[in-house]
Design a protein with these regions (language model features):
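Thiamine diphosphate
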Residues: 1-169, 173, 308-309, ...
């Protein structure tokens, strides 16, 4: 039986990177403050001391340059982990990511690859309008990129380990409010495959399809609903591209109702793609229209009371599901 240990989301990510650097001499980490400082969110703390400045590399504040160097290094046979402090700053590098990193393999006729792992953060945490955005849909829209958003320490380590073995570029999006969350995971290396959702809670009355921090909101709401005899199934997709449509459809065919719960905006967001596919592929099984809950369509306020109002929470999800089942 595998021994399980308790570890935070932050430390699980760090262990995945430590194992990769020990295992693969071509692996390097690069980004703003990742070395001496240990990362803005302390995810790389201690790795500079263990592996040195040649493998844990502090860069200038130049996101386009970070991704360009990482892409070139990957094309040359290295395995770079490029940290972009927040997904908001990834917009500065979007030309490199979308027009170079994502397309190298196809444009070279399959003879060249750029297996870069781009770690970044998304989500809210009193960081105001320009530092709290969720742009996962922008990157999930692009063929050639893998996009993942883990919700637990187990998934964070397993998916990052898989990313380090991948021969394709990976956008690895962490949530700023999950770094301190603890969870159980096995000792040593393990992988969580891309494109495989995890049913975090079994249920029969309704399916919530979600990911990242909203998984925890869904689980808490489901726990409260269970006290009233309502059994909600929670499907954490874990990766957005590729997305595990089979698990989603199997759940909806069982429960006959679906709520898509995300932290991005509703218009042209992830929730719309998932809802459309459910409505198309599982239409005959639905007892009610597919519903969506997302962030309010406003630039996010800094004030904590206004920020809280902009997002779904357990109480809002609870009320929405009661309405859907009425």
């Amino acid at each position: 039986m595998t021994d399980l240990i308790q570890m935070t989301y932050r430390d699980a990510l760090k262990e995945a990177m430590r194992e990769a650097l020990r295992r693969d001499e071509t692996a390097v980490i690069m980004g703003e403050e990742v070395g001496v400082w240990g990362g803005t969110y302390a995810v790389t703390r201690g790795l500079y001391d263990e592996f040195g400045a040649q493998r844990v590399i502090d860069t200038p504040i130049a996101e386009m340059g970070i991704i360009g160097v990482a892409t070139g290094a990957a094309m040359g046979g290295m395995k770079p982990i490029a940290e972009i402090m927040t997904i908001n700053f990834a917009l500065v590098a979007i030309d490199q990511i979308v027009n170079n990193t994502a397309k190298i393999h196809s444009m070279f006729g399959g003879t060249m690859r750029a297996p870069v792992v781009i770690r970044t953060t998304a989500g809210w945490g009193q960081l105001a309008a320009t530092h709290s955005q969720s742009f996962e849909a922008w990157f999930a829209y692009v063929p050639g990129l893998i996009v993942v958003m883990p919700s637990t320490a187990y998934d964070a380590k397993g998916l990052l380990t898989t990313a380090m073995y991948s021969q394709n570029p990976v956008i690895f999006i962490e949530h700023t409010r999950l770094y301190g969350e603890k969870g159980e995971l096995p000792k040593g290396e393990f992988r969580v495959p891309f494109g495989v959702a995890d049913v975090k809670r079994q249920g029969k009355d309704l399916t919530i399809v979600t990911y990242s921090r909203m998984t925890h909101v869904a689980l808490n709401a489901a726990k409260d609903l269970a006290q009233q005899g309502i059994e909600v199934e929670v499907v954490d997709v874990r990766s957005l591209r590729p997305l595990d449509w089979a698990t989603i459809m199997n759940s909806v065919r069982k429960t006959h109702r679906a709520l898509v719960l995300t932290e991005d905006w509703m218009t042209f967001g992830v929730s719309g793609e998932i809802a459309a596919r459910i409505a198309h592929d599982a239409f005959d099984y639905l007892d009610a229209p597919v519903e969506r809950m997302t962030q309010a369509e406003v630039p996010l306020p800094y004030a904590p009371n206004l920020e809280k109002m902009a997002f779904p929470d357990e109480a809002k999800v609870f009320a929405k599901i009661k309405e859907m089942l009425a």
